[in-house]
Each structure stands twice: as C-alpha cells, then as structure tokens.
Amino acid sequence: MKSEGESGPFQGILRDIEGRRKCYKQDWIRGIKTGIRILAPTCYIFFASSLPVVAFGEQLSKHTGGALSAVETLASTSICGIIHAIFGGQPLLIVGVAEPTIIMYTYLYSFCISRPDIGRELYLAWVAWVCVWTSVLLILLSIFNAGTIITRFTRIAGELFGMLIAVLFLQEAIKGLISEFHAPEIKNQETGKSHFLLIYANGLLAVIFSLGLLITALKSRRAKSWKYGFGWLRSFIGDYGVPLMVLLWTALSYTVPSEVLPSVPRRLFCPLPWEPASLYHWTVVKDMGKVPIMYILAAFIPGVMIAGLYFFDHSVASQMAQQKEFNLKNPSAYHYDIFLLGIITLICGLLGLPPSNGVLPQAPMHTKSLAVLNRQLIRKKMVKKAKECMKMKASKSEIYGRMQSVFIEMETSPPQDNSVATDLKELKEVVMRPDEGGDTKGKFDPDVHIEANLPVRVNEQRVSNLLQSVLVGLTLLAVTVIKMIPSSVLWGYFAYMAIDSLPGNQFWERLLLLFIPPSRLFKVLEGVHASFVELVPYRVIVTFTLFQLVYFLLCYGMTWIPMAGIFFPALFFLLISIREHLLPKLFDMQHLQVLDASDYEEIVAAPIQHSSFAYRKLGSSHHLSEGEDEFYDAEILDEMTTSRGEIRIRTISFKEVHPEPEEKHVTFEPH
C-alpha cells in the first residue's frame, strides 16, 4: 500500500478516486463483454455469500430474542453489496454481514435488556446511534489516511483473529447442538414420557444432520482433487458441493416418520419480509429520539470498538482480494473504501440493519473465480492463434508476436511499461527455443506450453459483484424455503466453517506440531510443509507458538466476560505495539520474520509438476476435452490457495535438490 502524497487530509481518498475513475467505465464494459460466462463466478460467489449470511441470521435471532433475523442479514448484505458494486473502489471485494458483527450485536443486546430505560424496545434505536458513531469514526479514519496503518497488522494478528472466529464458530455449533435437546418450541399435548421422547428424538436427529452436513461438506470441498469422475463433475461439486449438501440434508429431514410431530426436527425461525416483525426495523429512525442522551453519548464506546473491528476486517479482506500473485492491473482504493464503509454503516444503522463489511474467504474466492474465467478465455484464443500460425509455417518470432497481440488484446487494462514482456518471458523462451535435430521434446506445443507458462489474469469488472448482490436480495422472496432448513443443519454448517478455515493458518499448523514427538518430526519434512519448519529452530517455534496460544486464550476469555467482552478488538490493536517493541527483544529478528512473514510460503519435499502437464509430456495421444481444460484451471488455482484465500508460495527443498551433507538445514531440536 503506497503512502506517497497522503500526508494531508483527504489525500488518500482523492488519490483512490482518481485512480479508479480512469478504469470505472472499463469495469462495466469488460463485465458486459464477458457475456453469459460471467454467470459462473456470479453463482459461485452467490452461494458462498448467502449461506453464511443465513446462518448468521439464525445466530443473531437466537441471541437477540428475535429482534433481528436472516431477513435483516440478507437485506443488509444485498443493499451494501449493490452500493459497493456500483460506487466501491475495489469491485472484487465482497461485503456481507460477518461473525464479528454478530458478536458485537449480541453484546449490545445483553447491555440493553439489562437497562430498564432502554430495554428490548429501544435496542435497535440505540444500536442505530452506535452505528452513527461508528460511521463518523470510519469516515475520519479514511480522511486522515489511516488506511496505511493496516500494513502494521502482520500475520500474527490475522491468524489470531482467524483462529478466534473459528473457535467461536465451533462454540456456536456446540451450543446449538446442545440446545436441540432442550428445544422449547417442541410441544406435545401429552406430558411426561412422550414429551421427553420427542425432545430426545429431536436431539438425536440434530446430531445426525449436523455431523452429516459437516462430513459431506468437507468431502465435497475437496472434490476438485478427487481421482474419480469427469473434470466438469468434480469442478461442479467442488464449487457448489456445500449448498448441495445443505439441500440434501434438508430433504432427508422430511423422511422422518409421519408419527413424529411436524415440529421434529426443529427448523429455522425466520419471519416473512412483509410481517410486522420484519417491517419495524425500516422505521427504527423515528425511535432514535427516544433514547436518553446519556446512552447516546455512551454509544461512542462500542462505536470505537466496532469501527476498529470493521477497519481491520474490511482492509484485510480487501488486501486478500488483491494479492500481488493475482497480477491485478487496476489500482487499489483502501482509503476510499473505508470512507464508503462509513457511509454504508450509517445507512444500515438508520434502517435497523446489521452493517456489512468485507468478508473472508469470499473476497479472495471472488478474485480466484474471475482468474479462472479470464485464464480460460486468454488461453483458448492464444492456442487458436498459435496453431493458425504453425499451419502457415510462420517463423517463431511471428508465432510469439501473434500470441502476444492476443494477450494484449485480452488484457483487463492497458499494459504499462514492459509488464507484458515480463509476464510472457517464460512463454517467449519456450517458443523461441531452437530445435535440436529430430528431438521433439523441446518443440513448442501450444496445448502444453501455453497452459504451463500463462500468467494468472483476473477479469476485473463490477458486473459479477452486482449480480450476486441482487441475487442475495432476491433470496428474501424465498424465505418460506429457507424456513424449511433444519436448525441442526446450520449447526453443522458452523462447524464446517470453523474446520475449513484452519488449513493454511500457520498458528494452527504450529499447534499441531507441538503434538508430534521429536523422533517423528522427520515425517513433516516428507510432505509439503511451511518454510519455518526448516528455517527456524524447533524450540523457537514452540516458544513463539506458546506466546500466540496464551494471547489467543486471553482474547477468547474476554469474549466470555458479559460487559467487558465488547472490548476484545482492542487486544488486536495492542498486538501492533507488542509485535513492534516486545517480540524483537524475545526472538531473533530473522526467526521472527520467517514466523511472521507476510507471504504463505511452503516447501515441497521434491520437485513437483502439475498432473495435467506431466500427462501430456508423456506423449499420450488422449487429449483433454474443453471441459477438462477449464477444470484444470480451477484445480490449479484451488491448490494455489489456502482456505482463507491466501496464495501459497511453494519452493523446492534445498535438501532434496542439493543432497550433499555439508550443511544441515533441518533445525529440529529434541530437547
């Protein structure tokens, strides 16, 4: 993130507006020109966004006594998404109601019902004042260029925050599952044993449905790497497997014998959008004047915490959506997007809706889906042009020149300096490689070498974000369908979100490392492993991990304190000072830079090749179909990213490439 020219107020916002103004028109033209193919990433990100929002709505309804529900979370996600798609700086960023918002709104509800002069009646009105303060603070942060501060949040903060959210997801799943054995909604005219059996049956069915959803969702999430099935089928299951599993287990819930009451299993509580319970929040602004002045001023305190939380969460999501490995050509807009977030928060507060902000992993998932789309389009045109030139027996320089012209034509923004030459450097070397007699192994093959050497390109546009936000809004018309989902299926979905977010979190990987006996540590080196395993002594890894664990327990413990829990975001800002001043005194700077690196770097035990490339290199006469080509793009990018959407940077183990025993690189210490 650059800071040049941002010394004065408004400088960052003005620079962002100027940068995005130049490409705003093209953002729409590129999306429209993509045609019907834009529906694939649109549907993909729609399901990835809508399911968590429905789950958060159920959680919010449970913790706020029904004051807010899935209707409000869906409405907020849709309205904020449409505003951001049209007016936002970075259109690849996906916004939605997230878990931190649910946590803070739960604390605010607990505070309100404990105060007779506010109570449940003025809960949304007081929260609206909290949103007003939050909005003011976010706008001030953007005006004074606070966006540059986000670079001071290192991996340690992001992974602690991610682990906290994962544990809170798991906690919610466990609490929800236990509540199924005490469901008050399940009533029977008979008492005693019959009533107990119905409650018990509901609980057992909840265990089956939640575990079933959890296991099948985790399995389908990895479908792209399955050995079985056609590429298009594996790709479809990998992209849409989770919503399909929700549909499957919902359908299975209707196979319960008719002798059991209709209230078993328990299903989602969600008022219809046109019912009074859902209509009240649209007019909450008229009740804001009823809030006592003392509480209006007191709303500043949670406003500070929520502003800090949104600033951190929104900026990190934006960073992940535009990682350098995606090779985005359009400029970022961190300051302006924080300013717009302040406006969105104000609108949501006045409408009685929980605000939306940038979400993970949906934001980088959106970018990745558009990278697959654009890579398919570019490769097909380049392969076609190369084959045409080869039929005409054109020279190698002419073949490369024609392919370069296609690449420039398909670029999402005008090329700058020597960017195209740099991006196509490896492909040029392959094309211009001299033939060695009758050896055909080094001969240029468009089907093989273009795929292997084509850089990642993203279709940077606004249409997919706008369409998926509109679809989320249309989901409100399907509330009667949403109410058919068993609540236990959502508890399984919460557990899925928790477990699926752990791979790629180095804090989690180091925690697992603590349970491996020193005599078995060599097993870690036999597979893909994080770079710190070979570069940092084992005792340093243990010490650093224990520090993170203690700090994590402190953050998690604070969420259990009824009133003080609202201050848990302050611990993440305190971590900036700890990282800059305390940790360098406790750890060697080289070790600290590896353990707290900005990139997710992995080391493989031996040189690897992508299976599709190796298959073709063996000279097989079986060519992959068009559908298979498209799938391999998706599989490659899927393997390149962690569960939170972070790009993996893989390097070859020095020990494998240079097996001479003159230097020991593995630094595990048994004691």
UniProtKB/Swiss-Prot annotation:
Segments on the Extracellular face: 59-77, 145-157, 217-235, 313-332, 491-557
One of the GO biological process terms: monoatomic anion transport
GO cellular component terms attached to this protein's record: membrane
Keywords: Anion exchange, Ion transport, Membrane, Transmembrane, Transmembrane helix, Transport
Topology, Cytoplasmic side: 1-37, 99-123, 179-195, 257-291, 354-469, 579-671
Location of this chain's protein in the cell: Membrane
Gene3D superfamilies, sorted: Helical hairpin bin
GO molecular function: solute:inorganic anion antiporter activity
InterPro entries in UniProt: HCO3_transpt-like_TM_dom, HCO3_transpt_euk
Tree of life domain: Eukaryota
Entry's transmembrane regions: 38-58, 78-98, 124-144, 158-178, 196-216, 236-256, 292-312, 333-353, 470-490, 558-578
Chief place where the protein resides: membrane
Membrane topology: Multi-pass membrane protein
Family label: Belongs to the anion exchanger (TC 2.A.31.3) family.
Functional description taken from the UniProt entry: Probable boron transporter. Boron is essential for maintaining the integrity of plants cell walls.
Protein name as annotated: Probable boron transporter 6
Record organism: Arabidopsis thaliana
Lineage, uppermost ranks: Eukaryota, Viridiplantae, Streptophyta, Embryophyta, Tracheophyta
